[in-house]
Amino acid sequence: VNQSASASSLSASPSSIELRSGLRMPYVEAGDGELLLFVHGSLCDYRYWQPQLAGLSKRYRCVAVSLTHYWPATDSAADHPFSWSNHADEVAEFIARFGAGPAHVVGHSRGGCVAYHFARRHSEHVRTLTLADPGGPLQIAGRPPASLPETVNALRAKAAELIERGEVDAGLQLFVDSVSRPGFWAMSTPGFRRMATDNAHTLARQFRDPLPAYVPEDAADLRCPVLLIDGEKSPDMFHRTVTALQRWLPDARRETVRGASHGMNLAHPSAFNRYVDEFLLAMSAR
């Protein structure tokens, strides 16, 4: 997560696609060309990608989705499980029903993990994959099964507890600062704070559904071209994941957004958009 640009240039009333489950996935779109689909991370929704829709829609049909349970369709999914695995399959179903695939797919943070497993399971729906600071633990050979450090889990439990007690701002500050850098929540734009507050109800459910560890065997399954993007100032756990995936993936390149932390697509959108555009152009020329 990171601070959000204004969402004013996105349509006030998004479109949506109904899934087999009866849930709807809202989305906004801009531009024409090959389908470029954006998958948000924790506390976010389609509004997170406004600078990418503004900058990349000159060449691509840009579509930003809100995953099920997230704003603006927050109430409709209350009785359905909150699951990264379901989200991965729902991205595939969205592309199939949208009808313009296969897609170039960009995922950030938790959405990067969702996009990674979508691409592994549903290769027929993906042209290329871009993972920006993908979330989830890293499995190292010869070590016990990977999970997040206990200090991280304790912090996240405290954040969820604060939110469920009604101290939403304090809980969001604790979580957002932990995945970006201390003091970041206080400096965030009103647009980002509004988006995070709109999605605060998802945080406790997310923590009860831990992301799977990245392992070399899974990465070897992923045959599409992959662009890995990290922020120069992102927390070390993201750098370690990107470094490992760069080594494990059969067809990967890496770019680092200078001066940026975890929300590099918002802090430096022109650099982020340029890296994505150059990657897609290079892949189409192959």
Where are each of the predicted segments found?
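Conserved hydrolase catalytic core segment
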Residues: 100-144
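Conserved loop-alpha-helix segment in the C-terminal half of the alpha/beta-hydrolase fold
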Residues: 216-263
